[in-house]
Amino acid sequence: MSIYDIKVTDNKGNEVSMSDYKGKVLLIVNTATGCGFTPQYEGLEKMYEKFVDRGFEILDFPCNQFAFQAKGSDEQIHEFCTLNYNTKFPRFKKIKVNGGDAAEIFKYLKEQKKGRIKWNFTKFLVDAEGNVVDRFEPTTKPEDIEASVEKLLK
């Protein structure tokens, strides 16, 4: 199985195949709007704007598993991120990242880069061939990931 075999649901309820992202470098992040790390949205958006034209995407998966910090509907979360951080990268339906009912995408990511997700804003870097090449803890700021992204872009 590869990451491209997985299907996810966007924040409007549409099914999206991860194969739509073949050939792109991806940063997949579990997020929350009420977390101490929420201001990382600003750095994520800056990185997105810097690299999107070179084949880079950030995939935002809100998660309410950690201290219930992603409250509200998918629409409310999207509105919060757009109004407060002007984010333009793709946002998906709120999911779980740990446990038996974790989203398939996060089960896969954790198989590739071992370990439970401990908090919001854990980041997984995927190369253009679909390989999960790195995992960054929530304390890693987006600007500290830019060099790793740059190396993967053609």
Model-derived regions, located:
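Thiol-based oxidoreductase modules, predominantly thioredoxin-like and allied folds used
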Residues: 55-72, 88-99
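Short, internal strand/loop/helix patches
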Residues: 75-120
